[in-house]
């Protein structure tokens, strides 16, 4: 059986920092529509939420777990590693749903996809925002935040043979990217960054864009609930009118 036969629905979860909590609501809506992913690809915050879901937890389980966390404490590699080890299996092979984790290789700044071996180091590397985390060494290579090279990993799902790709997009620059397209008018760090994002949208069959309000920008229980609700509302609306 080839990969195209194995994977019907692929879910791509974007990076976006704390805004990534909206992915939980998106996953809950997918459950309500009886749409179980056969493959999950995640970048940065999307890799963490995706890993929790791929481990067999429901969206409600993940929300319950997230509600017990003082989120500012996770803004460091040691705390994040402890959280992952407490709540995730050791290896990709132990996951209930196949998972792809996107990281950025240094110094090349090219995307690298982990889908086997140890799980926690890959998650930490994918979430390693440069201004908050140290770079992560895996084997002989150095990695950082996956969002640098691939903020929305729809291409990963497509390359793995998924027949339908549903993308949950909480990237904070998304609205600017869609307005300016491939322009280099100073709104983006570089042309390649906006291009890879727009290509990801083109690889998606369905794109869910949670509308994130001010309450959802702040780390904390109130912000988390607002984000999850925004993800659920956006997903239900999009899935009803694809």
Describe each PLM feature range:
Residues 1-43, 51-242:
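Patatin-like phospholipase
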């Amino acid at each position: 059986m080839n990969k195209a036969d194995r994977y019907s629905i692929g879910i791509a979860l974007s990076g976006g920092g704390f805004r990534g909590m909206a992915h939980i609501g998106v996953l809950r809506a997918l459950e309500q529509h009886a749409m179980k992913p056969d493959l999950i690809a995640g970048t940065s915050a999307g890799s963490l939420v995706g890993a929790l879901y791929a481990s067999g937890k429901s969206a409600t389980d993940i929300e319950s777990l997230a509600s017990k966390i003082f989120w500012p404490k996770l803004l460091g590699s040691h705390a994040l590693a402890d959280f992952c080890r407490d709540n995730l299996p050791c290896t990709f092979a132990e996951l209930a749903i196949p998972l792809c984790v996107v990281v950025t290789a240094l110094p090349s700044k090219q995307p690298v996809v982990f889908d086997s071996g140890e799980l926690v180091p890959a998650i930490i590397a994918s979430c390693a925002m440069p201004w908050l985390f140290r770079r992560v060494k895996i084997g002989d290579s150095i990695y950082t935040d996956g969002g640098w090279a691939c903020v929305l990993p729809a291409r990963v799902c497509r390359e793995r043979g998924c027949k339908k790709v549903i993308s949950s997009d909480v990237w904070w620059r998304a609205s600017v990217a869609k307005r300016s397209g491939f322009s280099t008018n100073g709104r983006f760090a570089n042309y390649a960054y906006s291009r890879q994002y727009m290509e990801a949208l083109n690889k998606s069959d369905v794109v869910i864009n949670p509308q994130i309000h001010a309450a959802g920008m702040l780390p904390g229980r109130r912000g988390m609930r607002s984000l999850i609700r925004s993800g659920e509302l956006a997903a239900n609306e999009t899935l009803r009118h694809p």
